[in-house]
Each structure stands twice: as C-alpha cells, then as structure tokens.
C-alpha cells in the first residue's frame, strides 16, 4: 500500500536522526503513529537504556489524541522487541495500549526476538503487516544487523590517495611528513565518520610514523570518539588508551564485538587495509582521490578494480567514492 510506504519513509527518516554511538549496541529505530491518515505520534530510539522508538512515539501523542490510539496504525522500522531488557517489552506495551494495526519494516534477527515480537502481536489479535520497505529499513539498521547476523562489527575502510593511486611517499621516520591529501572539508567528513564508529584501527607503521590521535576533534558536534586499536601480531608497548588487535580474522572480529565494538573504522596503512580486503572483512569503503596530485612512486593504495562505487561526490575538487555491500 502506497500510504504504508509513505509513513514508513517517515519512520526511516526518524530512525536516521539517532546518533549511532548513543544507541549502540541497540539499532536505530523510528516509529510513527497514524490515525485516519493523520500523524498523531512520532518517535525514535535516542539512547541505549532509554525508551525505544515505539515508547517514545506513543509518549508523544497529545492528551486530546490519546483516545484515538486503539484505532491507529503504528509504523515501525524494526520488529518490536518481545523480551524484558533494560526497558520493558515493546510488543507487550503495544498490546496493552490496544493498537489496532502494526506495520513492520524488517524482522529483528536477535535470538531474543526473531519473530517473537510479531507472534505476540498476532496472538493478541493485532493486525500485523511485515516487510514494508524492508531493504530500506535494513539499511538504516545495518550496523545492528551485521552484529547480529555475522557476529562481528560493521567494518568501514577509509583512505586518501593520489591520482596515480599512492597513499604516501616512502618514509622512514616521523620527521618526514606525510603527503597531505585532505582539505578542511574532507577532514571534517573523516572525523564525522570516526564519531559514528565505536572502534578504529591502524597498523604498526602508521602508529610509528604518524603518531595519530584518531579523535574526532574536527567534528565537535559529537562527544563520541572511537576506541583505538593497533593491528600487530607482535607485543607492543602501547600508550594508555590503545589496545592490541593481533590479527584480521573472523575470530578477532568476534572478539571486538564482545568488547562492544559494534562498528570499526580501518584507517590504514596499506598493509592493514589489504589485510581486511583479503580477509573479505568489510562493509563499506570510502576513498578520497586527489586528481591534481601524482606521486609517481611510494606506498601503493589497495586496488579496487573489481568493485564499482555506489556513490561519487566531488568536494573541493577531490573525488569521494563510496563502495557499499549494503543496498
């Protein structure tokens, strides 16, 4: 139904407002309550441990509209939870409020839910429609779904390169400065990306040559900075605030998820990036290419010839490519 899709798009837009690091390990979820083709309530999950989207949606209903709730339709991007966690079961809350119809975007693969939320609603006599804009709803919850379905963080690779596909000149010491590719604007975009990830990893050579802070200081709108990891199979005397990641493997990624790293940003260097590509452990790749800079030789960037970007932007004369496995 076209009207169902219209209201589900609104729920998706609400879900996108959520700060990823505020809700993790929970998903981003949005909800809209509609009575006779009029929106009477909206909400989204804002922070882990606080009200879910369905609760916030119904709490937003004006007092004069509360009698309309039993005759309304709720649109929610993810299946309502059926279990008692930090917050009460949303499915049972909807049953208690007498909601007539619920339209669900996608199912929740969490073993504690996984169809149970919809079953509870149906058993109580609520009409349930599932799969409305399913792929779009899965997209907005992609970090959570990757955690649940693949048992690892959502992994993003990022690098900047010259027009002839080099990451940097060959350097031997920190005194030799790296080639500066990023503009103030693209640097801000990188720091915004950092703020959305709960972990960030670099290789040993990057740490030794660049001593990166890996904060999101150029994106002050978010208070979240990722947990820092060094990829090294050898013992390293790390400064406080760093942790060691010994390998790139499904097992090591599962370990990160158990350490509450729900999304991981891989910033380099070349060997570290290739390790994730060769292990086929990635979900998104961002490449900043500077068309007016050629190096001729140096540290070669990973090859993505077999992949096709799903988005290309131009900012300050730089080409920004995104490769994404999720639709």
Residue map of PLM features:
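Enzymes that bind and transform nitrogen-containing heteroaromatic metabolites
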Residues: 1-20, 26, 61-68, 153-327
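Zn2+-dependent cytidine deaminase-like catalytic core
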Residues: 9, 33-137, 275-277
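A structural motif shared across PLP-dependent enzymes of the aminotransferase-like
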Residues: 23-24, 28, 49-52
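A residue-level detector for well-ordered beta-strand positions
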Residues: 31-32, 159
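Short acidic, glycine/serine/threonine-rich loops at helix termini
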Residues: 87, 114-117, 141-143, 167-172, ...
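Short, hinge-like loop/turn segments at secondary-structure boundaries
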Residues: 119-122, 146-148, 218-220, 302-304
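Flexible, polar/acidic helix-loop-strand segments at domain edges
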Residues: 141-152
């Amino acid at each position: 139904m076209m009207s169902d899709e219209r209201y589900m798009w609104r729920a998706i837009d609400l879900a996108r407002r959520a700060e990823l690091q505020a809700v993790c390990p929970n998903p981003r979820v949005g909800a809209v309550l509609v009575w006779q083709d009029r929106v009477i309530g909206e909400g989204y999950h804002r922070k882990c441990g606080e009200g879910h989207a369905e609760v916030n949606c119904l709490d937003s209903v004006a007092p004069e509209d509360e009698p309309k709730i039993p005759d309304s339709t709720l649109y929610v991007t993810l299946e309502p939870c059926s279990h008692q966690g930090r917050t009460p079961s949303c499915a049972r809350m909807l049953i208690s409020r007498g909601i007539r119809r619920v339209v669900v975007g996608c199912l929740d693969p969490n073993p504690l839910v996984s169809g149970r939320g919809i079953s509870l609603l149906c058993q109580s006599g609520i009409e349930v429609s599932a799969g409305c804009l399913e792929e779009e709803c899965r997209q907005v919850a992609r970090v959570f779904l990757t955690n649940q379905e693949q048992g690892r963080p959502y992994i993003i690779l990022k690098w900047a390169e010259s027009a002839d596909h080099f990451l940097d000149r060959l350097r031997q010491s920190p005194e030799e400065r790296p080639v500066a590719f990023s503009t103030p604007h693209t640097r801000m975009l990188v720091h915004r990306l950092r703020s959305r990830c709960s972990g960030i990893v670099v290789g040993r050579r990057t740490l030794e040559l660049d001593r990166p802070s890996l904060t999101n200081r150029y994106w002050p709108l978010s208070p979240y900075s990722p947990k820092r990891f060094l990829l090294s199979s050898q013992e390293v005397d790390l400064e406080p605030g760093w942790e060691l990641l010994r390998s790139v493997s499904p097992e090591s990624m599962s370990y990160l998820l158990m350490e509450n790293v729900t999304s991981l940003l891989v910033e380099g260097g070349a060997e570290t990036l290739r390790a994730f590509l060769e292990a086929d452990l990635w979900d998104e790749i961002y490449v900043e290419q500077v068309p007016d800079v050629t190096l001729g030789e140096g540290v070669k960037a990973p090859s993505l010839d077999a992949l096709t970007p799903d988005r290309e932007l131009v900012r300050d004369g730089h080409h920004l490519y995104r490769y994404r496995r999720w639709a």
